[in-house]
């Protein structure tokens, strides 16, 4: 992971961070970060869904007059 940094150095660094910020503050920061990531993923999914709906709506639209007439005839035949 980190070249040149041993596991002991990472543990000492973690201990210093915990002493400086405290576990409650770190927990709050972690929760806020997790909420931000969750919100970002949700927004990305909503954007993809919106694009899918727009793409499907565009596919339903006839491209020209002839296509519109053919679609109307097909709907009349079904009825």
Swiss-Prot record:
> What is this protein's function per UniProt?
Part of the twin-arginine translocation (Tat) system that transports large folded proteins containing a characteristic twin-arginine motif in their signal peptide across membranes. TatA could form the protein-conducting channel of the Tat system.
What the entry lists under Gene3D superfamilies is as follows: 1.20.5.3310
Q: Which UniProt keywords apply?
A: Cell inner membrane, Cell membrane, Membrane, Protein transport, Translocation, Transmembrane, Transmembrane helix, Transport
GO CC term, one of those recorded: TAT protein transport complex
- Say yes or no: keyword Metal-binding present: no
Spell out the residue ranges making up region: Disordered.
44-79
- First-listed, main subcellular location of the protein, grouped into a coarse class: membrane
The molecule here is called: Sec-independent protein translocase protein TatA
> HAMAP family recorded for this chain?
TatA_E
Q: Reply yes or no: does the keyword Lyase apply.
A: no
Tell me the subunit arrangement. The Tat system comprises two distinct complexes: a TatABC complex, containing multiple copies of TatA, TatB and TatC subunits, and a separate TatA complex, containing only TatA subunits. Substrates initially bind to the TatABC complex, which probably triggers association of the separate TatA complex to form the active translocon.
Bias (Basic and acidic residues) occurs at: 44-58, 66-79
- Which BP terms in the Gene Ontology apply to this protein? protein transport by the Tat complex
Q: Where are the transmembrane segments?
A: 1-21
Which gene codes for it? Answer: tatA
Q: Which Pfam families match?
A: TatA_B_E
Q: Give the family from UniProt.
A: Belongs to the TatA/E family.
Topological type in the membrane: Single-pass membrane protein
* One GO molecular-function entry: protein transmembrane transporter activity
Q: Which compartments is it annotated to reside in?
A: Cell inner membrane
């Amino acid at each position: 992971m980190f070249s040149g940094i041993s596991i002991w150095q990472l543990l000492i660094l973690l201990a210093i961070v915990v002493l400086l910020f405290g576990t409650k503050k770190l927990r709050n920061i972690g929760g806020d970060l997790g909420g931000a990531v969750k919100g970002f993923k949700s927004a990305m999914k909503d954007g993809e869904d919106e694009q899918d709906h727009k793409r499907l709506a565009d596919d339903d639209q006839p491209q020209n007059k002839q296509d519109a007439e053919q679609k109307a005839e097909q709907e009349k035949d079904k009825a």
